[in-house]
Amino acid sequence: MVEARALTAPYQVRFRAGRNTASADTVKNGVGGSSGPRPHELLEAALATCMTISARMALVDMGLTDTGVSVVVTLDRQEAVTRFRYELVLDPPVDEAQYQAVAERVRQSPVRRTLGRALEFEPA
């Protein structure tokens, strides 16, 4: 569960997830700020973070604990479809079979599976 509360600055929000807190913000029509990520960037961050953790777990399972992982996620919001594009980077690079095994774990990451399903929104 995440709780979000509007702050006094226009469009600035403080949110809490468990014991962790952070801010989000946006600018619309010249109003607002940049004290934190914009809401859609939080979606990108959730996916990139989960994919990175999944990749790290796969690498540890393979005994490749010295391989660095980064995932870049970009959200493309169109009228008919919302598309998440992602790039998995392993440093130093691994062989193709290992890369494909890590990429499969990334494709099966929990947040990617969640966002890939039909979504419904309803009041609590």
State where each predicted segment sits.
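Extended beta-strand/beta-hairpin segments
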Residues: 1-45, 53-124
